[in-house]
From Swiss-Prot:
Recorded GO MF terms: metal-dependent deubiquitinase activity; translation initiation factor activity; translation initiation factor binding
Gene (name only): eIF3f1
InterPro entries the UniProt entry points to: eIF3f, EIF3F/CSN6-like_C, JAMM/MPN+_dom, MPN
Coiled coil: none
CDD domains: MPN_eIF3f
Keywords: Cytoplasm, Initiation factor, Protein biosynthesis
Swiss-Prot/TrEMBL GO biological process terms: antibacterial innate immune response; defense response to Gram-negative bacterium; formation of cytoplasmic translation initiation complex; positive regulation of Notch signaling pathway; positive regulation of peptidoglycan recognition protein signaling pathway
Protein name per UniProt: Eukaryotic translation initiation factor 3 subunit F-1
Amino acid sequence: MSALNLTVRVHPVVLFQVVDAFERRNADSHRVIGTLLGSVDKGVVEVTNCFCVPHKEHDDQVEAELSYALDMYDLNRKVNANESVVGWWATGNEVTNHSSVIHEYYARECNNPVHLTVDTSLQGGRMGLRAYVCIQLGVPGGKTGCMFTPIPVELTSYEPETFGLKLLQKTVGVSPAHRPKTVPPMLDLAQISEASTKLQSLLELILKYVDDVIAHKVTPDNAVGRQLLDLIHSVPHMTHEQFTQMFNANVRDLLMVITLSQLIKTQLQLNEKLTFLPTA
């Protein structure tokens, strides 16, 4: 498959690690680079992890600690054997003159490595994210070169990552003086209440869109219409009594799980206190 047909999907933990490495950089370092880890399947490069590679850039050369990069990769393979090298990342919003030299090294580590740039300056209040592949240019028997060509990049996340991002959003807009250092997970019933409230607001938004389309206030979108039709067909057909019975049964199961978890927590706390009691 051609490198130009690749699509890059980046997980949130990768961006967090890039920002953390940028914040911990040396005072004389203007750019931070590192290795991207993940997998490639059917033209999709999924980046699930990364690590920083110490380096120094001079006017005419680049010095990178390649032995450190190999050691970090070997350690990561022991934890997650499914992750392999898929490219490299760098902070900044542009490709520099040294990028081709660094990319040449990663081209020996994997096929069609991708180059990810993360703009940590937050210009415009957003973190710029771009992905590139290097295309070889030249004529047979003549001079050759390479050109970094942009490819599509998008953010994706697993369900636990989405849940963590929602917890982080609770601290957005809070002043640093009043910002909590920890955000504990909500109780199960509180999660159900919040999810129900959000579901209700989304349903109201859908109803408003449908009413506006019927009243010819909004131009209908066929893609949205197909998604709404699929959503309606996915709803199980049952009577109100059947739904109430099923809902009450699930609530009883949830309450039983909460009760048992609280009992186990109390037993563990009691066992901890008994362990530290002085013996006669």
